[in-house]
Structure formats: structure tokens, C-alpha cells
């Protein structure tokens, strides 16, 4: 019985790839590159760009948020793909 339970746990870990976390860039505008480890369950990164009175602005992070009209949004699904 213990062997069966252990086998099921191992199969679950292998099939679900537990422990993998997405890494996304999170620097703002033209700042030096920085990264963050996303929360469990996040599987995408984003890059938002827009212009305001300060010029062109860029925001990066985990997930794929909804944006207002006039903001360019790029979402991707590999580590550090939003640089």
C-alpha cells in the first residue's frame, strides 16, 4: 500500500512539473534589467508601453493584465521573454 501511494506521488510530481516558476523581467522603462520570480500558477509575462507627458513609458511584470485603450500590451510565455 505504501509503495502504491509513493508511486502515485512520484507520478503526480513528474506529470504536473511541480516546482516550476516563471521568471519575468520587471524593470521599468529604460532601467537596468531586473527579474522577478512569479507567483505559482502564473504562466506568462507582460510588457506595457505608452506615452505620457514624461515621454515613452514601459512597465514589465508577471501575468497578462487588461489595459486601457492607447496602451500597447505584449504577453509571452517563456522565461524573461518580456525584455
Swiss-Prot record:
One of its GO terms (molecular function) is acetylcholine receptor inhibitor activity. It is found in: Secreted. Disulfide bonds join 24-45, 38-62, 64-75, 76-81. Expressed by the venom gland. The keyword Transport does not apply. Residues 1-21 form the signal peptide. GO terms for cellular component: extracellular region. Keywords: Acetylcholine receptor inhibiting toxin, Disulfide bond, Ion channel impairing toxin, Neurotoxin, Postsynaptic neurotoxin, Secreted, Signal, Toxin. SUPFAM superfamilies: Snake toxin-like. Its main location: secreted. InterPro entries: Snake_3FTx, Snake_toxin-like_sf, Snake_toxin_con_site, Toxin_cobra-type. Bird-specific neurotoxin (tested on chicken) that acts as a pseudo-irreversible antagonist at the nicotinic acetylcholine receptor (nAChR) of the skeletal neuromuscular junction. Has no significant effect on the electrically-induced twitches of the rat isolated phrenic nerve-diaphragm preparation. Belongs to the three-finger toxin family. Short-chain subfamily. Type I alpha-neurotoxin sub-subfamily. This is Alpha-elapitoxin-Ppr1. It comes from Pseudechis porphyriacus (Red-bellied black snake).
Amino acid at each position: 500500500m505504501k509503495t502504491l501511494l509513493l508511486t502515485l506521488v512520484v507520478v503526480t510530481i513528474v506529470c504536473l512539473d511541480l516546482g516550476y516558476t516563471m521568471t519575468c523581467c520587471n524593470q521599468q522603462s529604460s532601467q537596468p534589467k531586473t527579474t522577478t520570480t512569479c507567483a505559482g500558477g502564473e504562466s506568462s509575462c507582460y510588457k506595457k508601453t505608452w506615452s505620457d507627458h514624461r515621454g515613452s513609458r514601459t512597465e514589465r511584470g508577471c501575468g497578462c493584465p487588461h489595459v486601457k485603450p492607447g496602451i500597447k500590451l505584449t504577453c509571452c510565455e517563456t522565461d524573461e521573454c518580456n525584455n
